[in-house]
Amino acid sequence: MSKETKKPFRQSVAEWRQFVYNPNSGEFLGRTAKSWGLILLFYLVFYGFLAALFTFTMWVMLQTLSNDIPKYRDRISSPGLMISPKPDTALEFYFNKSDAQSYAEYVSTLRKFLETYDDSKQSQNINCTPGKVFDQNDVAVKKACRFNLSELGQCSGKEDKTFGYSKGTPCVLVKMNRIIGLKPEGEPYIQCTSKEPGAVEINYFPSGGLIDLMYFPYYGKTLHAHYLQPLVAVQLAINSNSTNEEIAIECKILGSPNLKNEDDRDKFLGRIAFKVEMTE
């Protein structure tokens, strides 16, 4: 079998140059200017059509959505619970009541959080009727109910600037996550329990941990711009015999049949658990 004759290097270079540009036929990379123009025109029209189709499809979809209210809201039927301050160490509070530096971050977080609830920031909010859902479906601009810091009692930061941390009675603020259109039934309230009986005495502000219905429903950030979530302050009076011990606390929403507090797939649905350890 004869071997193929290898082309000289100069011949290969000449053929490559001719392929890139053929001066006899005026072809560039094997195509004339007309051929290149037709190909570019085809792809311009083709991809332009795809872009226009995509844009039109997105425009049609956006026409079905509201800027104010999510279209689908059935996946989240019950709110979760959140607390403030929120420790960096996985919802575990560690502090020394004799060392201001150990709880300084907690106090700072609470002060900053409550700034939005200051009377000066609620000038556009109104006094609502307690115990009654505040429906505003027929009003374009929704009014927000005033939340008075005095409702938080000893945890308001007015009388005790350390929110009880310097006295061994730390305060934790509990709130429900916002859900547009949610109308709690019954008389919802927050109840916290300790897994170590007798380790801590729990006090609530407002009394009984009540969450007033007048703060519902919520209409969304756009329509309800000045809305403030109702808060429940939980004050933990730690027993002197329980210092240097880790105390597990769990808070739940109770008193409302349409607010869930048990779900194995979502540990924050209607409840929240945290730990507190105080030293002296």
From Swiss-Prot:
Cite the record's note on assembly.
The sodium/potassium-transporting ATPase is composed of a catalytic alpha subunit, an auxiliary non-catalytic beta subunit and an additional regulatory subunit.
> Gene encoding it?
ATP1B3
**Entry-listed glycosylation sites:** 96, 148, 241
User: In the UniProt record, does the keyword Transferase occur?
Assistant: no
Q: Which GO terms describe its cellular component?
A: sodium:potassium-exchanging ATPase complex
Record carries keyword Lyase: no
Q: Which family does it belong to?
A: Belongs to the X(+)/potassium ATPases subunit beta family.
Q: Give me any GO biological process, just one.
A: potassium ion import across plasma membrane
Entry keyword set:
Cell membrane, Disulfide bond, Glycoprotein, Ion transport, Membrane, Potassium, Potassium transport, Signal-anchor, Sodium, Sodium transport, Sodium/potassium transport, Transmembrane, Transmembrane helix, Transport
The protein, known as = Sodium/potassium-transporting ATPase subunit beta-3
| Membrane topology of the entry | Single-pass type II membrane protein
Family annotation (InterPro entries): Na/K_ATPase_sub_beta, Na/K_ATPase_sub_beta_sf
Ranges facing Cytoplasmic side? 1-37
Which cysteine-cysteine pairs are annotated as disulfide bonds in the entry?
Answer: 128-145, 155-171, 192-251
Q: Which organism is it from?
A: Gallus gallus (Chicken)
